[in-house]
Amino acid sequence: MQKNLFLSFVVGALALASTPKAEACSDLIVGKKASTDGSVIISYAADSHTLYGELYHWAAMNHPKGAMREIREWDTHKPLGYIPEASTTYNVVGNMNEHQVAITESTWGGRKELGEANGIMDYGSLIYVSLQRSKSAREAIKTMTDLVRDYGYASSGESFTIADKNEVWVLEMIGKGKGKKGAVWVAIRIPDNAISAHANQARIHKIPFGDK
C-alpha cells in the first residue's frame, strides 16, 4: 500500500500574503493509522469569507555561496531583515514541498509582552523557508527552531502542524519578551492512531520534559 500525505486546502487557506492576518485558522490532523489507506492527512482553513485561495510556488534551486535571502513579514510585507540562503532549496507548491513535508498553522496570540520587536522570522516566513529546506517533519521542526534561535521570532503565539508521509507533529511557539532573542517552543508528535485539531487555541497543555 502506497502511503501519501494529503494536504487539503479549504477555501481561503492560502491567502495570507495579500490580506490582514487571519486569526481564525483551523487545522485538522489524521494520523496514518487513523486513515483508511494509511496516509497522514492534514487540512488548513482560514475560516473567513474575506480570504480567497492562492497557490504559491517556489522552484527548487541551487544558490551561490554567500547568497542572502530577504525576509518580509508575511501579512504586511514589511521588511524584517536578511538571513543566509541555503545552498539548495526544494520545490514548494502551496504548503507542501517535493518531499511531502507540509506545514500549516493557527494563531493563538498569547501575552503581548512576550513579543520580540527586533525578530526577523515571522510565522509565515518560518513556514515557507522551512518547507524549502526540509526533507522530513523532524527536520522542519529543527529548521524552524534554529531560525528563531539565530534570527529572532517576529510573531505572537502560534500552533504549527508539521507533517510528512510518516508522521505529524504540533509545534507551539511564542516569543521570550522584550530584549530576549528567540522563542519558547515545544513540539509533540500526534499518535499514529489519533485524530486531532487546533483552531486559535494552544493545544499543548502538559509538557513531557523527560521525553526528548
For each feature predicted by the language model, list its residue ranges.
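Second-shell loop/turn segments in exported
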Residues: 115-117, 125-134
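Sec/Tat signal peptide C-region and signal peptidase I cleavage site
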Residues: 18-24
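Bacterial N-terminal signal peptides
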Residues: 8-17
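Bacterial N-terminal signal peptides that target proteins for export
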Residues: 1-9
